[in-house]
Amino acid sequence: MKRTVSIISIFLLCFSLSAQDSLSIKSQIDALQKQYDVNFVYDPGIIQGIDSKEITLSGKNIKKDLSAVFSGTGIDWELRKNFVVLSKEYEQELSSNIDTLEAARITTDKLRRTNRTQTGLNHLDASKLLSGYAVMSTPDIVKVLQTMPGVASGSELMSGLYVHGGTGSDNLYLLDGVPLYQVSHLAGLFSSFNSDIVESVDFYKSGFPARYGGRLSSVVDVNTKAGDFNEYHGSFSIGLIDGRFNIGGPIVKGKTSFNLSLRRSWLDVVTVPTFAIINAVNRKYGEKTWFGYSLWDVNGSITHKFSEDNVLRLNLYNGQDRMKLSNKSLPTDDDPSTDISSVKVNWGNSLASLDWNWRFDDKMSMRSMLYYTRYNGKMAYGYEDRSNDTKVFSGDKEESGNISRVQDIGLKTDFWWMPAEKHLVRFGASVQPHFYRAERYAEYSRYVDGNEIPDSTASNGAKYYGTEFSSYIEDEMKLTGWMSLNAGLRYSAYQTGRKVYHSLEPRAALTFSVHPSVDIRASYSEMSQFNHQVSSVYMDLPTNLWMPSTESVRPMRSRQVAAGVYARLPENMSLSVEGYWKTMSGLIEYVGKSTLFPPIDSWESQFTSGKGRTWGVEIQYQWVTAVDNLDFSYTLSWSQRNFEKIWNGWYADRFDNRHKINVSYTRKFTKRFDAYIAWCWHSGNRMTVADYMVDTRHVFTMGDKPVKVEMEGFAVSEIPFYTRPNNVKIPDYHRMDLGCNWHRVTKRGNESIWNLSIYNVYCRMNPFYAVVGRNGMYSSEIKARAYGLVPIIPSFSYTLKF
């Protein structure tokens, strides 16, 4: 099969171009480069075999000189600022161009990461996501981001993202510009982003542009693919615990297209025979257990082009988790009753948006969006006691649970204005009404002769409303040939009840090009967050609540300075060293009794406000070719907290991982086979353990009588004493992952891929939780023992593209 292929290598630096090209035309390119201070971008093969021409360069008009050099050669040129991009069309077997095209794409992506103004920005495209980290053979965006320097992952296999000492709930997740509140499936095993439909991800850790706001620590901006306007494309994947399907194409050719992507797990199907066997074995013990779990994601979009400059797009998304666990004690001759206990957990996101993009002219364009987004979480417990076909539980059936819901309606408009070639101004505004609901309930009903009679319902809940308004202006310009600036200002206001909070957030990022291949960048940014995730545990569970800032709980705020050196090295290598310092205020921490459900009534009184600080250095090295991809990163960081009601002074954060190393290597051995290996290690998380127990009868007295000490309503004779919070570091975390892909072409010309992945190759049982107890029956010393839960996990998947 022959096709016309245009080979363009974008942003390839002149100092790394091959010296084995045709000397005649190469010398003319060098002369133009020196004369006009431009960089030529091209594939070395396109100038081979071209005869030299005797010409005289004018030195006054670059366009005339370019036309003189390349006229009659078949080479097309395009002037892009201070780059000249060369391309050439020719017919050749497509298979022989795969590596060249891949090299051009990889080089472009590598230089995109280093040729920008912002610090702390990582750009990922679809190919990077699909070729990287895959647990259960399912590529996952958040799992890839967890491997980035400056990011802590929290508990193993969870979707935690603790960026630069953040809290985990201070990351702004955007799906096509719409915020998501919950991005975890299966308790964090997967994220809510289906990689089949993802086009690109921009991940900001510092140097935030003024157009982003509402969270403290990071921005994860996920953009999905629009459907093809001329042809139908799709894919089908089946894995160990889930399946995926994607299809897109024209509705009206050249005018309207669609893209639909589905993902669903079949754990609920797989567990049916498993628990059938378990129940057959346990029947003699009079017990029956049932477990069902399912998750799904549905992404859809319809795009209509009124013209090339006027595009309207409708985006829809729904992602849900459903879990039920029940245990049933069967009747016996001695006890004819049947006890049933159950747990139900549901959570998920839904969103809809209408996105209008209008390009007025070459200098002005606009994007306006109306959207709705909702998060809903529910956990419920139930218990029944059946006797002689009549259900009785002290005359009642009981179900109690917890509900958390957040709904946003938003309208935002952004403008792009380019007053000059190297000058871009962005500005816009948005308004977001927020609706929060938190509820704890208990329902009782009586069964008489098999009929359910509602008895009573008890509930306590809270509803909050808040309106967030923001506006910004952002100016990006190239001040000189060696200095670029991105400066902006964001204003936000939040009304909750009779209280209005105002926030002015300056942003600035500056780049100095000290060498054609070396940049020095620095940035300063301030961020505000008006909503809080209320949790009484250190895990992202459906029981957690979202609450707004109130008159007594102020918004959170962060200030961050970052600076670094970024080098583009020969042989497709890059190296960056970046440091940061960040402070946070308005953080909240739970100080109430230990419980799974966070408080709802007067929740502000059971949380205390404090501050945080974090600093560190990140080193990242990359080597990327058409067949090899090596990525190494190291992070040295400190993360501390200061809550006066918890401790008088600074102490280490729970996820204060001092050192972190990530190494990954991908190799394309042939066109049909590639493999990857990854290894990660970081210092262990921290936990609070009492240093010793003190007998209070010999310590506290009032006059001649000992004081009676009570903890949670029980009189005790001893209490724990701590040196400081998070005083113990659990063992370090490390593991290795392997994976490989087999590619083949089916008889119909479609690509199929077999993937085999192994998570935790050497079965390191990394600490997941710890048990605290005495170091001996009569000892006052305390010891803690960590336990691991996640062993080696092999998995596979099959993908067919059409």
Predicted regions mapped to residue ranges:
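C-terminal beta-signal and adjacent terminal beta-strands/loops
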Residues: V269-V270, R672, W681-V716, P731-R735, ...
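Flexible loop and strand-edge segments within Gram-negative outer membrane beta-barrel domains
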Residues: F291, V311-R359, R374-R405, P542
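Transmembrane beta-barrel wall of Gram-negative outer-membrane proteins
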Residues: I241-S265, V281-L325, K344-S365, Y372, ...
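Periplasmic N-terminal accessory/gating domains of Gram-negative outer-membrane beta-barrel systems
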Residues: R116-S169, G177-S195, S200-F208, K225
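Gram-negative outer-membrane beta-barrel transporters
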Residues: W581-T583, S605-D691
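Surface-exposed extracellular loop regions of Gram-negative outer-membrane beta-barrel proteins
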Residues: R322, N376, A442, P516-V561, ...
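Outer membrane beta-barrel strand-and-loop segments of large Gram-negative receptors
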Residues: D408-K412, S459-Y464, T550, R554, ...
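Short, acidic, small-residue-rich periplasmic hinge/interaction motif at the N-terminus
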Residues: I29, Q33-Y36, T73, F83-S131, ...
